[in-house]
Amino acid sequence: MLFGYLVGFLAADPEERMTSGGKRVVVLRLGVKSRVGSKDETVWCRCNIWNNRYDKMIPYLKKGSSVIVAGELSVESYMGRDGSPQASISVSVDTLKFNSGSSRPESRGSDEGRQRSNDNVSLGFEGESLDTEIALDKEVYAGFGEDQQYASEDVPF
């Protein structure tokens, strides 16, 4: 099982669907910023919220909302419009949180307001907390550019 945390912005309002078996699923399209060298890229992920989980949060999720998603990751393949093979990332959502920190300047409040709103941010596991204040003054990226160094024994392949 591959489990991960994603921080990003919703590309559209949540979409409610029903499977052929009658199960309810709410689909979020999440754009996650990443940086490769000096080039910024957005990775698009489909996040599936099954049954009635997070029903009280879903009405507050809108296009542009910044969220933190944790769950089981999978890679799915499909044929593109031009007939070439494509891949997409899908997440079966286990934890969903509003991200009070945002890299969008228009959505930032005062430093004092941001600090108060970050006091109770958690990752969804007992005893673990997320210190978002450190990341608030940086762009929300999977990595912070080329200054990350890895020893060869750290790379799993």
Curated annotation (Swiss-Prot):
Annotated Basic and acidic residues bias: 105-117
Record bears the keyword DNA-binding: yes
A Pfam family matched in the record: SSB
Record-level GO BP terms: DNA replication
GO molecular function, a single term: single-stranded DNA binding
Keywords: DNA-binding
A cellular component annotation (GO) from this entry: nucleoid
Every SSB domain range: 1-100
Region spans: Disordered: 97-126
Top-rank lineage group of the source organism: Bacteria
Signal peptide range: none
Subunit structure: Homotetramer.
Protein name per its UniProtKB record: Single-stranded DNA-binding protein
Organism: Chlamydia muridarum (strain MoPn / Nigg)
The encoding gene: ssb
